[in-house]
Design a protein with these regions (language model features):
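Bacterial Sec-dependent N-terminal signal peptides
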Residues: 1-26
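Juxtacatalytic substrate-recognition/specificity segment
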Residues: 22-159, 164-165, 183-184, 248
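Surface-exposed helix-capping loop/turn segments at secondary-structure junctions
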Residues: 75-83, 225, 229-232, 285-288
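Extracytoplasmic/secreted envelope proteins and their assembly/folding machinery
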Residues: 63-70, 74, 133, 137, ...
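Active-site-proximal alpha-helical
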Residues: 49, 166-168, 172-183, 190-255
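Beta/coil-rich, acidic/histidine-enriched accessory regions frequently appended to metallopeptidases
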Residues: 26, 30-31, 39-41, 234-237, ...
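Residue-level detector of short, conserved catalytic/binding motifs and their immediate flanks
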Residues: 11, 85, 171
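Short amphipathic alpha-helical interaction/hinge segments
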Residues: 148, 184, 188, 264, ...
Length: 300
């Protein structure tokens, strides 16, 4: 699996099950801006936070979330971002879709993005502070990872910069920004039990999908449990050694990619397959009582 290069200019977080990647840029269409934004700024120790309208209270909460994440990530990454980080907050997703920070169209399923060239993080408030915190933390993982990888390769005078594959980038952002919640559990359990789970070597088949995010997150949870949390950082620190990320994984974990993949897959089967015990397919274990129409409110 070749390592992805820096032309990945925008890194997105998905907030739905839609298959969304950089492919959503629609050429030949014009982005319409409905509102004029009068920007204000909050400056904290590490961030320049831009907001508009009557959004000060939420922006201040976002500032606290960002500083909290900064203190945590400088330890996790064993590195620090020395430049000031611009955070751009929008009051709603509709306003977020009008942003001129990217010329591309932003679908409803995108909950924020990190723009690589100028290092800007752009996030809408969707009405949930928990989700707002999650997205801020997710995007700041991208900021720290980008800085970490840049420093590692700069110190070794490597000019052809390397990046991990998207499943690792997004998987780590999810793993270090949020807990393994019931939605993640539902997605992975469904994939394993219904034959839709994709092993590492075939991860490109689900490139940019919500399943890719959750499989990447779960794989890194597996690495932390099986090989040690420190191995995740080691994979980033070893990226300069190889042209293929599979080789980075093998070198860091000390096993072949096939062995690692098999262990991960087997652990998930052990966890989820027992759920089939005493279960029957609906066509076998139940009787169809209606032939036509839809049952919107079945009686119990």
């Amino acid at each position: 699996m070749p390592i992805k290069r820096f032309p990945l200019l925008l890194i997105f977080i998905l907030i739905s099950f839609n298959t969304i990647s950089a492919q959503f840029f629609n050429f030949g269409r014009n982005k319409v801006t409905y509102e004029d934004f009068e920007w204000k700024i909050i400056q904290t120790e590490h961030f320049d936070i831009y907001y508009s309208g009557e959004f000060l209270e939420i922006a201040e909460i976002g500032a606290e979330y960002a500083e909290e994440a900064f203190d945590e990530y400088k330890i996790k990454f064993n590195d620090i971002v020395t430049r000031r980080i611009p955070l751009v907050f929008y009051n709603t997703h509709i306003q977020f879709q009008q942003t001129n920070i990217t010329s591309g169209f932003i679908p409803e399923g995108v909950g924020g993005f990190f723009e690589f060239l100028k290092g800007r993080v752009v996030i809408p408030h969707m009405g949930s502070l928990e989700q707002f915190r999650h997205v801020i933390r997710h995007e700041l993982v991208h900021v720290f990872m980008t800085q970490k990888l840049f420093n590692i390769q700069k110190d070794r005078r490597i000019t052809n910069r390397k990046m991990p594959p998207l499943w690792f980038i997004e998987g780590l952002a999810e793993y270090w920004s949020y807990y393994w919640d019931t939605q993640a559990e539902m997605i992975l359990r469904d994939a394993v039990l219904n034959g839709n789970f994709i092993p590492l070597k075939d991860m490109l088949r689900i490139y940019g999908t919500f399943l890719m995010y959750k499989e990447g997150q779960n794989f890194l949870m597996f690495v932390a449990d099986e090989y040690g949390e420190d191995k995740i950082l080691k994979m980033m620190e070893n990226i300069w050694r190889f042209s293929k990320f599979e080789d980075v994984i093998e070198y860091t974990l000390g096993e072949t990619i096939e062995e690692i993949d098999e262990k991960w897959t087997h652990s998930l089967k052990q966890k989820y397959y027992p759920l089939y015990q005493n279960k029957f397919p609906h066509t076998v274990g139940s009787n169809k009582i209606t032939e036509e129409g839809f049952n919107f409110s079945p009686a119990i």
